[in-house]
Amino acid sequence: MTTPHKKVSPKAPVLAADACPRCGTTMKEAHGVLRLPVNGEDVAVPHAAHLRCPKCKEVVLRLEDARRLGEDAIAIYRKKHGLLSAGDIRAIRERFELTQGDLAKLLHLGQNTVSRWESGRNVQTAAMDVLLRLLRDVPGSLEYLRSHAA
């Protein structure tokens, strides 16, 4: 008994790692302002590292540059709107010797949400920001939240 062979379709040409996906020209390292939406708002990130095609002007981000761009955009958004920074949130949690899971339970959130806030990958809502500030600034608020935790 013979095994049927799969038909192999012709492969698309493979581009070099630094080739523009649009026109194939070698991309060049660049730094400049890139814009990224955060909570529906367009945030300008200065000095963002990226690759730019000198021919067609296509912009491509390396994975690490894309992560950094997202984190920088969120930090700029937080600062513009007066929200606590990722470090501020971590400091509040550590001040009360809470794990991310403990804080998430107190705030009726998933543990991953707190992790994303602290790593700068997501931004907290204004309401959660106020709740975190109350926890930090108002004596007795931790006990109140514990008595009402899920």
Where is each model-derived feature located?
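Intrinsically disordered/low-complexity terminal segments and short unstructured peptides
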Residues: 1-2, 112
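Amphipathic alpha-helical "recognition" segments
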Residues: 116-137, 142-145
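Extended interfacial segments that mediate partner engagement and assembly in macromolecular machines
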Residues: 61-127
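N-terminal flexible/basic segments that precede or flank functional cores
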Residues: 2-6, 11-83, 137-150
